[in-house]
Amino acid sequence: MALLKVAPSRLLSRALQLASRVQNCTPTVTTARRNFHFTVYGRKDTSAKVSDSISTQYPVVDHEFDAVVVGAGGAGLRAAFGLSEAGFNTACITKLFPTRSHTVAAQGGINAALGNMEDDDWRWHFYDTVKGSDWLGDQDAIHYMTEQAPASVIELENYGMPFSRTEQGKIYQRAFGGQSLKYGKGGQAHRCCCVADRTGHSLLHTLYGRSLRYDTSYFVEYFALDLLMENGECRGVIALCMEDGSIHRFRAKNTVIATGGYGRTFFSCTSAHTSTGDGTAMVTRAGLPCQDLEFVQFHPTGIYGAGCLITEGCRGEGGILINSEGERFMERYAPVAKDLASRDVVSRSMTIEIREGRGCGKDKDHVYLQLHHLPPSQLASRLPGISETAMIFAGVDVTKEPIPVLPTVHYNMGGIPTNYKGQVITHVNGEDRVVPGLYSCGEAASASVHGANRLGANSLLDLVVFGRACALSIAESCKPGEAVPSIKENAGEESVANLDKLRYANGSTRTSEIRINMQKTMQNHAAVFRTGSVLKEGCEKLSVINSSMDDIKTFDRGIVWNTDLVETLELQNLMLCALQTINGAEARKESRGAHAREDYKVRIDEYDFSKPLQGQQKKSFNEHWRKHTLSYVDKKGKVSLEYRPVIDTTLNEDCASVPPAIRSY
């Protein structure tokens, strides 16, 4: 703790000690307060050295790796140990201990056409995912993900993931929303593999356990600040060690961003407080685009008043949504799928019920999820976590009474634009171009397999398929031990200057005050239903709130475990995500998937698919909205938008593309 009061020269001495520790560390490294049972700095990182080129106020340590992964959730772990398994000297930087990552909160399951409950085909899964995306998903990436799904689940089983089982010993698969057989003509599919209702917890711990087999260098509780970019190429990451305030520059030939979503831009969400869009913001500050951030998924069943997630698996097991009249109202909105329609459809239906006065409770501002008609033994075996969560956060015994629920922000379909190999792309002169050295996967990325709306249980699949894809792509294009490109001597100095600016910020507005203003603006102006006037007002309000960042006040001037500073850095990241989200929503004058405009209620494609195509003239690219939004933010907070086409072709003839059609359940 002496670092709080020592002079800059003493800090440099501390940095020398850090570098010495890096060069001489053993498999177990003793830090100031704990023993980690895996290497923190890594045995191979003998090239780490002290630099004073960007700061004399902070210890600065330079590292060199073949690859750096930012984030240690499901996608980050799968990418990291995939790279280490292929022989790459790999670092994994994470602001959380790996098993604290938000993947742990996923409940329902992971989709794969295993066919354990009835005959199934990955092509039917492909069709459902394209339809679920409201035809904004890129079909080459969806083809890749759904075809890889069965092998990915079997791989997890081989890693030791304890899937729920049928009486015959096969992996149990439950029904989930938007899933069908025979291209929508064969009834409800049972495609969701699960570990009761704790699938994300099991997945994360399984991947973490597997990762310990490999010699990955984990830098735990390091906050990634920015990408190190040179001439349009990514050459690594600069990060803050939260434990001692040292700065670390990770120079690498390949960088993978797997930092998760930005759910905390909204006031009510199912996301952890750490879901702050760090990677998305890093890409934005690097001058690269983000894609489709206006598409924010509202999960139909967050606990009323608490926002905690109640898995879609409840409805997959037979749970139903009812209004104040006791009516199973989804039968009116989705006559075939009913309570297992896609999430955007169910969330809008619930909102309409509440608006029209059929909500529950004294304020009629929520609906009920009924489970007590199901056998208690089924609830105990298939939904044990939900039974516990409902009792803790709603005071409800699910065997006797319904759970009060409300649509709650849950997932970000948009993110960092990538191709199906995980390579980050930009769109220049009508063509997609790869950003050399930069990859992304998981919720941080937009491949785009989810398009305008994600199907439940496709997110965990996304993590493992594209985490692995990033590792495979790097292994295809690079070899372990290749020369790592150099960086400028002053690379990262802007990041350190920003860190110092926030650490000593002495304005009049607390970080928490600006954050709550941003979150409530997003909640009130970019919710389930949106209108142009409300979105425009939200854009103007958010611009003012962003300007108030210049008047921010922090209180902790130290560098050791400065949570005030870290929360302010996270607020900067959230603000960049929020600006792009609401401006993209205001500009998109149609309704598609999770983006529902009350002043533009129809989906605007190249053709009107509600009518015969014969005789219709195809709309030009500028006239229709079946295209991806690319958003940029300049240093003053001004958002600019561009657009790129949706990819309608599949990878090969094994799977036919699905042409746009009316989307109904």
From Swiss-Prot:
Record-listed Tele-8alpha-FAD histidine modification sites: 102
Catalytic activities: a ubiquinone + succinate = a ubiquinol + fumarate; (R)-malate + a quinone = enol-oxaloacetate + a quinol; (S)-malate + a quinone = enol-oxaloacetate + a quinol
Residues of the active site: 343 (proton acceptor)
Gene Ontology MF, one: flavin adenine dinucleotide binding
Domain of life: Eukaryota
Pathway listed: Carbohydrate metabolism; tricarboxylic acid cycle; fumarate from succinate (eukaryal route): step 1/1
Enzyme class label: oxidoreductase
Activity regulation note: Enol-oxaloacetate inhibits the succinate dehydrogenase activity.
Membrane topology: Peripheral membrane protein
Pfam families named in the record: FAD_binding_2, Succ_DH_flav_C
Keywords tagged on the record: Electron transport, FAD, Flavoprotein, Membrane, Mitochondrion, Mitochondrion inner membrane, Oxidoreductase, Transit peptide, Transport, Tricarboxylic acid cycle
InterPro entries in UniProt: FAD-dep_OxRdtase_2_FAD-bd, FAD/NAD-bd_sf, FRD_SDH_FAD_BS, Fum_R/Succ_DH_flav-like_C_sf, Fum_Rdtase/Succ_DH_flav-like_C, SdhA/FrdA/AprA, Succ_DH/fumarate_Rdtase_cat_sf, Succ_DH_flav_su_fwd
Required co-factors: FAD
Binding site for FAD: 72, 75, 94-95, 101, 103, 108, 224, 278, 443, 459-460
Family: Belongs to the FAD-dependent oxidoreductase 2 family. FRD/SDH subfamily.
Subunit-level organization: Component of complex II composed of four subunits: a flavoprotein (FP), an iron-sulfur protein (IP), and a cytochrome b composed of a large and a small subunit.
Protein name (Swiss-Prot/TrEMBL): Succinate dehydrogenase [ubiquinone] flavoprotein subunit A, mitochondrial
Organism per entry: Xenopus laevis
Native organism taxonomy: Eukaryota, Metazoa, Chordata, Craniata, Vertebrata
Gene expressing this chain: sdha-a
